[in-house]
Amino acid sequence: MGFKKIGVACGVNPLPGLKIKAWLIATGSDLDMEVEVVESAQEMPLEPPTPRIALGDRKIAAFLAASELQKAGCEAVIIPDVRTEPFLPELQKELQVPVISLLAGLPESLKAEGIRRIGLLGRAVPQDFYEKIFGADFEFVKLAEDLTPIYDILQSPGEALKKHGFSPENEEMMMKAGEKLLEAGAEVLIPNCTQMARFAEELRLRGLPVIDLLRNAAVEAVKATPKRLPKPFKVGLIGGLGPAATVDLYDKIVKATPAKTDQEHIKVVVEQNPQIPDRTAALLRGGVDPTLAMFNCAKRLEDDECDAIIVPCNTAHAFLPYLQRFIRTPFINMQQAALDEIKAKLGDKARIGLLATTGTVQTGIYSDKAKAMGLAMFVPDAEHQERVMAAIYGPKGAKAGYTDGVCREDLLSAAEVLVRDGCNCLILGCTELPLILDESDDFEVAGAHMVVIDPTAALARKVVKTAEEAFERTGIH
């Protein structure tokens, strides 16, 4: 015996939802398959003040219900609402769980039966929507003007069908409408109102050739459950360390993305927390440990279903091993991205000079990786390391808003020392340093020509490459 788990957004339209539930179970029984039906009770707000707000209510309620059912592990979802049909593509774009249309498979099956002329029983959705779905092989019978008041009564919110069900008065009105459509040449009738769809069985017993949309969707969901769709790549960014570095990384991701439209850019979620304790202070002076604050950010990004997490702070990477013991989402490592680019540019001939905070230097987050890759790495002597720190933290440094003058002189003096050590490459290993020196493939220092790598830019390029690889696999931005 097989098994299927199907979700129904019953709260959007409770009674039609129950009918779909019954059809799902019955179809499973016919196919010797156990069907677990999961219901969402998400309702639409009452009494929207305008038609546009009513449409927004319907879209958002359908999305909330489908999202809930997706999280519950459903293999497919049915929204028991004819008015939802026109925006199912919008809904599906935001979800991975397949949303089964009430009209699923109908154009093909009706064409196979030789049926060409269709009448719409109700007017919840404009006729041109159906004409687009069914195509040129079908002709829809024009709505007779005298049916409009009948449909208005039957579809009245809180009255008629919704309130009184298949009463003699409602039966008479539906039969009259159906017979009019048949007289006009319709071969079959499609309920263009969810409440009318609810009574398809009763109308068929009275001789009207009404297609049972609720049964149709249930059968399609069980017999031909589509595969869950891949989701677009989404990167999570632990922001706030520092705020300007967060903006810088995001800006570099945008600039590195080869997009021609807004829609081709990468989904980015920023968990901005400037209150994360200072990483350098924690490493060098016994300051407050930032591990929990960083973990909380990473967990939120993981819960938001990010595919990768990035951190726009070199020193913060020293704390990632603690997070990675609990966070399943992979981190794209800034130092590794920078070193991979250097290896690609210079190979084993690379002699790397590291310009970074003393905390970053002491943690070995660069040197340990460089050693594992067989790359030589050097740092300034103590005197010039102090000048690097002054370029970052000093009263005329980058964190104080300066990008030229004393801070640049301090940084270049440290770079000159590294040139004397034979370095042919510099890593700007603090997010403030690219504000002072630009990334370059040919930067002259003390008569030597060097490659200068901005790890933030390298990380941005790695994010874009990872996103492009995901797009090649899924075809989804």
Predicted regions and their residues:
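Non-catalytic structural scaffold of enzyme domains
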Residues: M1-H477
